[in-house]
């Protein structure tokens, strides 16, 4: 997320023993990451998905083009392995790391099917920055598992009138904000 500062990145990298950062290639993000690296010894690789690929970052798209064909590992992941980690908002101190296993997405079938009342014909929009857990549980797992279409609106600044215009123009049928 573009909201993390150098301090936030250092804390999270060290708390989670992060090995690689994959990020949008925008200076508001990459400058903070670059500044955090001297205090983030576990990080070995930086990858930018563009549009810019700063010095010290690998180009995600070139990496995909040069990648060898996928080979299934001898020992694939199990449902109990860590799939995803969130950090809490830190309202009562430093953010706390919360790990989820590979069964976590299944819990959000209920979110998409019953809370959002989604069908295969639904077009769903969740308003949340990808740095927040809501971005995952509110617009990916239960929604896609349930077969709904997910509307993505990448906006620089939250502007209610622009959101309402997108909802109207694209006939969004479900909203979570």
Where are these regions (language model features)?
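Conserved pre-ATP/AMP-binding loop-to-beta segment of ANL
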Residues: 48-58, 65-87, 94, 117-123
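Conserved S/T- and glycine-rich ATP-binding loop of Class I adenylate-forming
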Residues: 21, 82, 88-91, 124, ...
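Structural core segment of the AMP-binding/adenylate-forming
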Residues: 1-62, 176
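Short hydrophobic/charged patches on amphipathic alpha-helices used for structural packing
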Residues: 10, 74, 161-164
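Conserved AMP-binding A3 loop
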Residues: 83-107
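Adenylate-forming
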Residues: 12, 63-64, 88, 105
């Amino acid at each position: 997320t573009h909201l993390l500062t150098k301090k936030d990145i250092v804390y999270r990298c060290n708390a989670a023993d992060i090995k690689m950062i994959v990020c949008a290639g925008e200076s508001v993000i990459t400058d903070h990451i670059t500044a955090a690296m001297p205090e983030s010894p576990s990080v070995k690789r930086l990858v930018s998905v563009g549009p810019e690929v700063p010095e010290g970052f690998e180009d995600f798209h070139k990496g995909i083009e040069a990648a060898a064909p996928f080979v299934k590992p001898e020992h694939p992941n199990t449902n109990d392995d860590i799939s995803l980690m969130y950090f809490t908002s830190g309202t009562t101190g430093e953010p706390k790391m919360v790990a989820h296993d590979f069964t976590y997405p299944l819990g959000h079938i209920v979110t998409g099917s019953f809370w959002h009342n989604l069908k295969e014909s639904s077009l769903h929009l969740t308003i949340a920055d990808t740095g927040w857990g809501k971005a995952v549980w509110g617009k990916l797992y239960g929604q896609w598992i349930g077969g709904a279409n997910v509307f993505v609106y990448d906006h620089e600044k939250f502007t209610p009138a622009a959101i309402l215009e997108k909802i109207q123009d694209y006939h969004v049928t479900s909203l979570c904000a």
